[in-house]
Amino acid sequence: MEPPQCVEELEDDVFQPEDGEPGTQPGSLLSADLFAQSQLDCPLSRLQLFPLTHCCGPGLRPVSQEDKATQTLSPASPSQGVMLPCGVTEEPQRLFYGNAGYRLPLPASFPAGSALGEQPPEGQFLQHRAEVQIARKLQCIADQFHRLHMQQHQQNRDRAWRQVFLFLQNLALNRRENREGVGPW
């Protein structure tokens, strides 16, 4: 099973330690090849919480493969009967819309008078970039949690409808036994 194209294109400083840091050995769990493994080898995919592509943002996927569950629904969606998690009365506001996470504004610490061609001090740039990548990963985790919660809610609802259907089927097929009180009791 080939890893998805987006895993090969991923440039992620958060999971690529500097030379000499622990975890830079080839067999280490912190090595940069962690997310380039097959889905069976990926330690996070074994938890069934993160697919292999959990580290890929929406901008790295082709539009045909983009995960629609991470997109915000239109404001008219509550009138269309969209399910929300238990106890939630309104749809949560997304931090990023579509590919907007890749077009973040300049950090507040960026000097306003400097030209865009100038680079901020190296430490600030790397810190800001790491924060953005962590925010993307947290957003991805939150989306996955919401998806799993909605899936569980749907399964519970399907189970309840199945029980109602079986009750009505039993009632219709066993009319004589139900009328005469004949049964296993």
UniProtKB/Swiss-Prot annotation:
Keywords: Apoptosis
Gene Ontology terms describing biological process: anoikis; cellular response to starvation; cellular response to UV; negative regulation of apoptotic signaling pathway; negative regulation of autophagic cell death; negative regulation of autophagy; positive regulation of apoptotic process; positive regulation of apoptotic signaling pathway
Short name of any one Pfam family annotated for the protein: BMF
Chain spans, region Interaction with DLC2: 67-75
GO CC annotations on file: acrosomal vesicle; actin cytoskeleton; cytoplasm; myosin complex
Biased composition range(s): Acidic residues: 8-21
Motif (BH3): 134-148
Annotated spans, Disordered: 1-28
Subunit structure comment from the entry: Interacts with MCL1, BCL2, BCL2L1/BCL-Xl, BCL2A1 and BCL2L2/BCL-w. Interacts with the myosin V actin motor complex through its binding to DLC2.
Family indicated by similarity: Belongs to the Bcl-2 family.
Described purpose of this protein according to its UniProt entry: May play a role in apoptosis.
Protein name, per record: Bcl-2-modifying factor
